[in-house]
Design a protein with these regions (language model features):
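N-terminal Rossmann-like dinucleotide-binding module
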Residues: 1-43, 169-170
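Conserved acidic residues
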Residues: 26, 59, 139
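Beta-loop-alpha module in the N-terminal Rossmann-like domain of NAD(P)-dependent dehydrogenases
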Residues: 45-101
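A contiguous active-site-proximal alpha/beta segment in oxidoreductase catalytic domains
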Residues: 91-153, 165
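Rossmann-like dinucleotide-binding domain that binds NAD(P)(H)
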Residues: 148-181
Length: 181
C-alpha cells in the first residue's frame, strides 16, 4: 500500500515517521512548502501540493491537519478513490461526519479515525476484562485525565482529548449511553 500524509505538524511528523519505517510512505504535503520539503528530504519521499495529492498513485491518504480542514480533505480523498485515515476529530459536526461515512461506503473505501488509544495494551486488557464479565455489568464510567501533555494554543483542548476518552468509553460500553452527566 502506498500512503501520502497531509499535514506535517507535531502529530503529522509522527505519522510520517511511522509510515516511512513501514516502507509505505510515498508523498508528504504541508501548507508550509519548506516544511514539506524538509520532511520529504529527511524520509526520501516526494512532496506535492494539496490539490495534486488526490491525483497521485497512492492507495491511501493520511490527514493530520487542523480539525477544521478534515472534512474537505477527507471528502476530496474519498472522491478520488483513496482510502482515508484522518486524525480525530473526523469532522466538526455530525452532518459532515455522516456525509463522510456515507461517501466511504458508496466509494467502497476505508475511512478510519485515529483513535489510537483503542489499540493501547492497557485499554485492550480492560476491554477484555469488561467483555468477559470480570467487572459485571457496567453501570457508570468516570474518566479523568492525569497527563494533559503539551499544551498547544492552536487547538481547543476539547478537540485534543475528549475524542479519545469518548471513543474508549464507547468501546467499553459497547453501546451508546442513555445519559451523560
Amino acid at each position: 500500500m502506498k500512503i501520502a500524509v497531509v499535514g506535517c505538524g507535531y502529530w503529522g511528523r509522527n505519522l510520517v515517521r511511522n509510515f516511512s519505517e513501514l516502507g509505505t510512505l510515498k508523498y508528504v504535503c504541508d501548507s508550509d512548502r519548506s516544511t514539506a520539503e524538509a520532511i520529504g528530504d529527511q524520509h526520501n519521499v516526494s512532496t506535492t501540493e494539496l490539490d495534486n495529492i488526490f491525483e497521485t498513485e497512492v492507495d491511501g491518504i493520511v490527514i493530520a491537519t487542523p480539525a477544521a480542514q478534515h472534512f474537505e480533505i477527507a471528502k476530496a480523498a474519498l472522491q478520488s478513490q483513496k482510502h482515508v485515515f484522518v486524525e480525530k476529530p473526523l469532522a466538526l459536526n455530525v452532518e459532515e461526519a455522516e456525509a463522510l461515512c456515507a461517501l466511504s461506503k458508496q466509494q467502497k473505501k476505508v475511512l478510519m479515525v485515529g483513535h489510537l488509544l483503542q489499540y493501547h495494551s492497557a485499554f485492550l486488557k480492560l476491554k477484555s476484562i469488561v467483555s468477559d464479565g470480570g467487572l459485571g455489568k457496567l453501570q457508570y464510567i468516570y474518566s479523568n485525565r492525569l497527563n494533559l501533555g503539551k499544551f498547544r494554543n492552536e487547538e481547543n483542548i476539547l478537540w485534543s482529548f475528549a475524542p479519545h476518552d469518548i471513543s474508549m468509553i464507547l468501546g467499553l460500553a459497547g453501546d451508546i449511553p442513555k445519559t451523560v452527566t
